[in-house]
Amino acid sequence: MAVGKEILTKIRSVQNTQKITRAMQMVSTSKMRKTQERMRAARPYAEKVRTVMAHLAQANAELGHPLLARRETIKRAGIILVSSDKGLCGGLNVNSFKRFFGKVKELQDQGIEVDVCCLGQKGLAAAQRARLNVVASAVHLGDMPKMEKLIGPLTVLFRQYAEGELDAVYIVYSSFVNTMKQEPALEQLLPLTPHHMVVEHSHSWDYLYEPDAPTLMEFLVRRYLESVVYQALAENMASEQAARMVAMKAATDNAGNTIKQLRLVYNKARQAAITTELSEIVAGAAAV
C-alpha cells in the first residue's frame, strides 16, 4: 500500500492548506467590514472640504493657488499608484497595474515624461521592475493607515506641481463596487477639474474667514487633495480584503474538492489492494 500512503500524505497536506485558507477567509471577512466602515466614514469629510473650497473659490474669484493652476501643455505628469502590501487577493493588483501601465504608455507615446509615487509594496515592486522614475513611496501602511505616512510622499508630487515641474497628477486605485466586484479607477487629481470647484448655491451669504481667505484656501486645497488620496487608499483596502476573502473562499472550496477526489482515488487503490490480496489467498488455498 505504498501508493495508498502517498495519497494519504497528499490528503493531509491539502487539509492543512485548507485550514490556512479558511482562516484567511475568516480574517479577511472581518477586516473587510472594518475597511468598509472606514471607507464610508472618509467620504463625508472629503465632500465637506470640497464644498467649502468650491464656495470659497466662487465667492472670491480673485483667489489663486499654485495647485489650481492649469497648464497649456503637459510635458511631465505624475501618477500615484495605490496597491496592496500583500498578495493572495486574486487579480486585484493585476487589474490596477493594467490601468496604470496603460496610462503610462499613453502619456509616453505623447512624449510626456512620467514620475510615479507608489502607495503599497506591490505597486512599488511593479514600478521598479518596469524601471519607471519612482520619486516617492509609502509601504507597509498596515490595516489602519495614518495620514502622517502619506503626507511625505504626497508633498513631493504637490510641490513639484506647484513649482511647475509637473503639469498634471493622476491617481490609480481599485474602486470598491461591492463584495464581488472591484474595478480599477483612474482619476485626475491635479489640476482640479471644473466639477470639483462647482457647488450649488442655496443662499447668498459668505463665510467669515479667519485669519483670511488666501490662508484658508492654502489649507483647504491641500486637505482636500490629501482626503481624496486617503479615500482612494481606503477604497483600495476595502477592495483588497473583499478580493482576498473571495480568493480564499475559492481556494478553500477547491481544496475540499481535491480532498474528495484524493479520497476516491485512495479508496479505489485500497479496494484494488484488498481484492488482490484476497485473490492471492484464494489462489494459494486452491493450490494446497
From Swiss-Prot:
NCBIfam families: ATPsyn_F1gamma, PRK05621.1-1. The keyword Cell membrane applies. Keywords: ATP synthesis, Cell inner membrane, Cell membrane, CF(1), Hydrogen ion transport, Ion transport, Membrane, Transport. It is found in: Cell inner membrane. This is ATP synthase gamma chain. F-type ATPases have 2 components, CF(1) - the catalytic core - and CF(0) - the membrane proton channel. CF(1) has five subunits: alpha(3), beta(3), gamma(1), delta(1), epsilon(1). CF(0) has three main subunits: a, b and c. Its main location: membrane. The lineage of its organism: Bacteria, Pseudomonadati, Pseudomonadota, Betaproteobacteria, Neisseriales. Belongs to the ATPase gamma chain family. PROSITE patterns: ATPASE_GAMMA (PS00153). GO terms for cellular component: plasma membrane; proton-transporting ATP synthase complex. It is a peripheral membrane protein. Gene3D superfamilies: 3.40.1380.10, ATP synthase, gamma subunit, helix hairpin domain. Signal peptide: none annotated. It holds the Pfam family ATP-synt. InterPro entries: ATP_synth_F1_ATPase_gsu, ATP_synth_F1_gsu, ATP_synth_F1_gsu_CS. It comes from the Bacteria.
